[in-house]
Amino acid sequence: MNTTPFHSDPPPSRIQRKLVVEVVEARNILPKDGQGSSSAYVVVDFDAQKKRTSTKFRDLNPIWNEMLDFAVSDPKNMDYDELDIEVYNDKRFGNGGGRKNHFLGRVKIYGSQFSRRGEEGLVYFPLEKKSVFSWIRGEIGLKIYYYDEAADEDTAGGGGGQQQQQQQQQFHPPQQEADEQQHQQQFHPPPQQMMNIPPEKPNVVVVEEGRVFESAQSQRYTETHQQPPVVIVEESPPQHVMQGPNDNHPHRNDNHPQRPPSPPPPPSAGEVHYYPPEVRKMQVGRPPGGDRIRVTKRPPNGDYSPRVINSKTGGGETTMEKKTHHPYNLVEPMQYLFVRIVKARGLPPNESAYVKVRTSNHFVRSKPAVNRPGESVDSPEWNQVFALGHNRSDSAVTGATLEISAWDASSESFLGGVCFDLSEVPVRDPPDSPLAPQWYRLEGSGADQNSGRISGDIQLSVWIGTQVDEAFPEAWSSDAPHVAHTRSKVYQSPKLWYLRVTVLEAQDLHIAPNLPPLTAPEIRVKAQLGFQSARTRRGSMNNHSGSFHWHEDMIFVAGEPLEDCLVLMVEDRTTKEATLLGHAMIPVSSIEQRIDERFVPSKWHTLEGEGGGGGGGGGPGGGGGGGPYCGRISLRLCLEGGYHVLEEAAHVCSDFRPTAKQLWKPPIGILELGILGARGLLPMKAKNGGKGSTDAYCVAKYGKKWVRTRTITDSFDPRWHEQYTWQVYDPCTVLTVGVFDNWRMFSDASDDRPDTRIGKIRIRVSTLESNKVYTNSYPLLVLLPSGMKKMGEIEVAVRFACPSLLPDVCAAYGQPLLPRMHYIRPLGVAQQDALRGAATKMVAAWLARAEPPLGPEVVRYMLDADSHAWSMRKSKANWYRIVGVLAWAVGLAKWLDNIRRWRNPVTTVLVHILYLVLVWYPDLVVPTAFLYVVMIGVWYYRFRPKIPAGMDIRLSQAETVDPDELDEEFDTIPSSRRPEVIRARYDRLRILAVRVQTILGDFAAQGERIQALVSWRDPRATKLFIAICLVITIVLYAVPAKMVAVALGFYYLRHPMFRDTMPTASLNFFRRLPSLSDRLI
């Protein structure tokens, strides 16, 4: 065993960190004093230190502007500390009837949200409830920041306890000071005294997957006292992947004196490793030193498994030393040089001026200027922003400049320019206010100035910022013609409604009189809304009045702004040729909206003949069109706002809210997504003489919000570092992120080439722990006709920020998944599939009209529009999923078979004892069963998934797929393959259908045998069964039930020496019962 001597503790640090909480104001707090007001004060609790502000007398919008400072005992673990801020109403300033200070709200902030001094800003936090039944409103404005200051050794070592004691004295009443001091001396001795305390026994610290199970006292103890030796058992990843010593251990103490032998070098940013490499540390009393045992363990799917990456972005679980860039703390800040060019004035005569922007690394030109009507050409306007990549080293270079010059597009003559020193360009970081544009005098060479060719001013602003800047989404990164298709963009899906059309009755129809005898006219109503159409069944005729009745519902999908018209056509289909009897056009915007099941009155609409423009409500004379009167039709129309219009597959749906906003419930949290970048993308196109290239961008979809990152051109390892947020209304939803190759940026308006899919991932929100950052790398997998192919990897950081209390989140699990109308008036499965296809087309058409457009192929891929297509591979995957679900039953049957065969006599005897206890005390059966489930859940906690799972190729049966099955999966409908190929596939499908047919027949036969027990199809078998049942009845009446249960159980568990290898008499009796199989033709 190799041993390594321990090192002595490092000297105490002379740097002390302070946390400052500036309580600014509160707004719209709840009145609690019984007189319509509140006298509020704030209590701040951090690291066992409490402080309070002054009380503001009777003010619902109090302003404090008070600063409270706290000592940070462990700066390295500050990100995991909690800052509790509570607002109370002071009972002393009330009406005298209160016994305690009333609670007005609370805010809980984690240390990862603290900012360094100089980067803080005023942030308003909504006040939260303490319990489900609390009534809280309002918000509180805070400034929170920290700073480090120098402190002497006494202050750093022993001043913490004294300062904490003083803070406790400041908050608590004087009568509690003595008790507090005694309590602190008892449980928090100074460090000088702690060094003399002998250890009672070695502590046991288990570090598992980034979680530390250790008391706070033991953590403080390890900082000042030498620990026993450490034996480390580590499961490391494969050799080609490195893991640093501090990965996935956010709570690990960096000052720990023990060091394992030969530690690997620390990982660099962006390094990846398989999750989870498990490290367990057990402290034992052995000689100094430690052993390391490495066990290589590969993930189940190899290179197709998601991995944890170590990033500089920080956020929680991958690194300890991180900087918070609130609220964009999931991605790395990328600096850009922003140049906003607004307009110019007093320019020399020109036709179409433009601006050139030049640095040492970039050269771009603006679009041609726009001159307002009525203004001279010497005052052009551009209103354009450029975002050029910038590094700190660019500003540090001596003489680095930014040149902005104006030029005449027709003659390419120089109109003047401005030069900036990059070292003097200001740095802007939101929430700083935007820099106001300023006028700069255009300059040129000395000859140009003397000749008068250079004149005028240009209005612009220059600053250095990051991708957080509000000007970044609309900024131009280059002057290429296709730059509009490379910008980032946020889209919103259209608001979709279900349009319910109830066709009731039609009167005064002009039916042809020359019908054959005894022939009833076949009258149908066809409804059409855009590309959607539906037709009713044959109407029933009333012989007395000559009217036709249907009472049939048709449902369509209508999208805002509701500009379409609903067209109703009454057709006579008695003959082969359909005859139009009349039509009516109804604007969708005029249809009544409802959000519940209330009754909507019907209206009569006039039917018009050829040339009519529309039908209005009323009687025969109430039409407003220009065509002849052809009858009238009674309709009940309404826009259903109580349904959720499904445009996604139900199993990957990201939103279940109804259309009507009045029915929305408050959000339960915020989903934050940081799209870091991609690695190892494959070439998707060839340009510049056959050189492979990829122009990748990402699309993320959750709820009604779509986001699109900017396109990184000609890069196989693009880095986006863009962060987006969504409000979460239901945790049982799915976030979808896709990667595409941009083809539209190279095509003109006449040649619209679709973008190529690279891959996508799905993350279910319910699998994320609250307020925890997951920074992972997921493989991008695409199923091609040649098989499964890995197109690269995407790196994302995701966090489900859940500020609400736990009951608010858990209450969502007990609520219905879909809105109320889906259960009161449910829609059929086939009808939902048709409506989903229509909704997908409408969303795709809506997003295709945006700039830059989101292509229909992108929308269909993100919405899984082809998820219901036939595939032999999917059928096999679903079959094995069923087998996996029933595996527990198979395992239980095998376990019982091993028990009854006495494979393990000790276990069988224990089962006998447990069976006796349960039979004699039947009240313990149900509690024992639930206790067993609890134990199973606790046991499987060790094997819980540590990161959100990605696409599983083994579950999808995509590892080894038959080429012909893949070709069949990608075949169109109707098929485009040769007849002999289709015939071979049909024969193969028939063979599979025979197996299914046989299994269904066997199931039916077993059920029919059960029915034959009392159906007298076999008289002798029925007589025997009735006689056996009579004997069992007499025995159960005469013998106690417990005795019968014990006898049956012991008979079932009897030793194999008392068994017969032949089937039992009861099984033979059941197999001899007749079924209906012999009656099949």
From Swiss-Prot:
Query: Which subcellular locations apply to this protein?
Result: Cell membrane; Cytoplasm; Golgi apparatus membrane; Cell junction, Plasmodesma
Its GO biological process annotations read:
anisotropic cell growth; gynoecium development; plant organ development; plasmodesmata-mediated intercellular transport; positive regulation of flower development; tissue morphogenesis
What lineage does UniProt assign to this protein's organism? Eukaryota, Viridiplantae, Streptophyta, Embryophyta, Tracheophyta
Protein name per UniProt: Protein QUIRKY
| Free-text cofactor note | Binds Ca(2+) via the C2 domains in absence of phospholipids.
Tissue specificity comment: Observed mainly in flowers, and, to a lower extent, in seedlings, roots, shoots, leaves, stems and inflorescences. Expressed in the vascular tissues of roots, cotyledons and rosette leaves. Accumulates in roots meristems.
- Cofactors, names only: Ca(2+)
Low complexity bias: start-end ranges:
163-176
Q: Which family does it belong to?
A: Belongs to the MCTP family.
Query: How does gene deletion manifest?
Result: STRUBBELIG-like (sub-like) mutant (SLM) phenotype characterized by defects in outer integument development, floral organ shape, and stem twisting, as well as cellular defects in the floral meristem and in root hair patterning. Alterated pistil morphogenesis, such as twisting of the gynoecium, as a result of abnormal division patterns and anisotropic growth of clustered epidermal valve cells arranged sporadically along the gynoecium, phenotypes associated with disorganised cortical microtubule (CMT) networks; twisting of organsm is strongly reduced by a concomitant mutation in BOTERO.
A molecular function (GO) held by this record is: metal ion binding
Keywords for the protein's UniProt record, in alphabetical order? Calcium, Cell junction, Cell membrane, Cytoplasm, Developmental protein, Golgi apparatus, Membrane, Metal-binding, Repeat, Transmembrane, Transmembrane helix
| Residues annotated to bind Ca(2+) 2 | E351, D408, S413
Bias (Basic and acidic residues) occurs at 248-257
All copies of the C2 domain together span: 1-124, 318-440, 477-605, 652-778
Q: Which residues bind Ca(2+) 1?
A: E351, S352, D408
Entry's Pfam families?
C2, PRT_C
Record text on subunit structure and interactions: Interacts with SUB/SCM and POQ at the plasma membrane. Binds to SUB/SCM at plasmodesmata (PD) in root epidermal cells to promote tissue morphogenesis.
Q: Which PANTHER family match?
A: PHOSPHORIBOSYLANTHRANILATE TRANSFERASE ISOFORM 1, PROTEIN QUIRKY
Q: Which residues cross the membrane?
A: 879-899, 916-936, 1024-1044
- What this chain does, per the record? May be involved in Ca 2(+)-dependent signaling and membrane trafficking. Plays a role in fruit dehiscence. Components of the machinery involved in organ development mediated by the receptor-like kinase STRUBBELIG (SUB). Collaboratively with SUB and POQ, regulates cell growth anisotropy during gynoecium development, thus linking together cell-cell communication and cellular growth. Together with SUB/SCM, links RLK-dependent signal transduction and intercellular communication mediated by plasmodesmata (PD) to regulate tissue morphogenesis.
Point to the regions of Pro residues compositional bias.
258-268
Coarsely, its chief localization is membrane
